[in-house]
Design a protein with these regions (language model features):
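Positively charged
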Residues: 1-154
Length: 154
């Protein structure tokens, strides 16, 4: 298990647009495994490559329907509907929580570790997580979606 350091707000990779993944090889498989291990250790719902200083279009989410970790490589939201308000935090912005407005349902098209395309439609917190992690790939932090900060989460 190789844990990666999660970088925090102010780190350069968090404000950059990531490059597409073009090589689906053992190095990518290792990166995905490291990100999954790091996500488990951090006890989060998702992790994007720029959060570990890697400028690739790759995110890991925990799918609320299956409870499995899913790699979203070169992801693109193809449809969204409705609106939901949720409380969000971010592993790269520790200790900060805010109410955000996100789509209620999203459909994302992405590649898996083998380069095969797939599509998934999710709602609830998984939809929020998909939007949150894909924002990271474009240099956007969740603060840009906060409508109200929460002082005490307990």
């Amino acid at each position: 298990m190789a844990l990666r350091e999660i970088v925090t707000e102010g780190y350069e990779s968090l404000s950059k647009i990531c490059k597409p993944v073009t090589s689906f090889d053992s190095r990518l498989e290792l990166l995905v495994k490291d990100m999954k291990d790091t996500l488990v250790k951090a006890d989060g719902l998702g992790l994007a490559a720029p959060q570990i200083g890697v400028l690739k279009r790759l995110a890991i989410i925990i799918d609320g329907e299956t409870e499995e970790m899913v790699a979203l490589i070169n992801p693109e939201i193809t449809a969204m509907s409705g609106v939901q308000n949720k409380t969000e935090g971010c592993l790269s912005v520790p200790g900060v929580w805010g109410k955000t407005e996100r789509p209620a349902v999203v459909t994302v098209k992405a590649q898996n570790e083998k380069g095969e395309w797939f599509e998934m439609t999710r709602d609830g917190i998984t939809a929020v997580c998909i939007c949150h992690e894909l924002d990271h790939l474009d240099g956007i932090l969740f603060r840009e979606h906060v409508v109200e900060y929460i002082e005490d989460r307990d």
